[in-house]
Amino acid sequence: MKNLPGIRSWSKIHNSQMNPNVSASKINLFNADIPMFVMNYGIGKRSESPPAAVRGIVIEDAVASVLQGRRSIDEAVIKACERFVQVFYALQNDSHKQYNLIRPMIELSCEALKDYGIPIFNPDGTQEKIEYTLKQDTWEIPVVGYLDFVFPNGKIVDLKTTTRCPSVMSLSHQIQRAIYQTARPDHEVEFLYVTPKKFQFLSDGDVPTLMDEIKTTVKRMDTFCSLMSPEQAAMSIPINPESFYWRDQYTLQRIYNEQTKPKTKRKTKTKTLEKME
């Protein structure tokens, strides 16, 4: 990293998660919700994964096992359901709803990717990591990310399980795709959206234009971090408890709001000598 002093200063804070690099998730969170960005990367506290996020993780792993021939679809579904229940052992409300989506989403994902070939992973089974340097004028910073599925046919697919299939990719997903496409220009990057009833491949957004927007965001992020410490940001920027990021996150709300309280110095006991008569 070069000439981005704000990001560098946050990366050196004790307990900070602000590594001296950027990713699609870091950029998108900065664009979407500054207080949660402060909480995650500055204060170093994150929320527990909601049922929909856990559903997405177990489905992605299940689809990989089927495409690699390690499991049948039925076996993959059983394993995915077991993993989900390990996290949400008491299926209630949203967790029960997400549990019921696992089978149809695995089946449709495998159907969508059946002709793509066997995906390529690292020897230890982990996803392929991308890393390159983003530069503009006098500054530069590493960009990192992980690819869901890399196929021998020259395609990279990022799997998105959702209850509603979009007609156009969201800006946050376009930013993510642009980062991946820039890292692997010899491949075609697609996003596969899978609902319980259908699937669709999308690849929206002009990559050069999006990369210019990403550079602007990185510079804004650095300026923000230069002007405020995480504590100063928490004292200045209120959270919206009704937003997607903060809803039901009562522990994180408390931790964030505690940053506004003045730090009390520990009192040290001093011994006094009494004058003897």
Model-identified regions with their sequence ranges:
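Metal-dependent nuclease catalytic cores that hydrolyze phosphodiester bonds in DNA/RNA
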Residues: 1-146, 255-256, 260, 264-277
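Metal-dependent nuclease catalytic regions and adjoining charged, substrate-binding loops involved
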Residues: 22, 110, 139, 169, ...
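Short connector loops/turns at beta-strand edges and beta->alpha or beta->beta junctions
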Residues: 35, 155, 195-196
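Short, solvent-exposed loop/turn segments at secondary-structure junctions
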Residues: 44, 162-164, 195-198
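Glycine-rich loops and low-complexity Gly/Arg-rich segments
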Residues: 55, 64-65, 150, 181-184, ...
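Solvent-exposed, well-ordered amphipathic alpha-helical segments
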Residues: 119-128, 150-157, 181-191, 203-210
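Non-catalytic protein-protein interaction segments used by genome-maintenance enzymes to assemble
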Residues: 132-179, 183
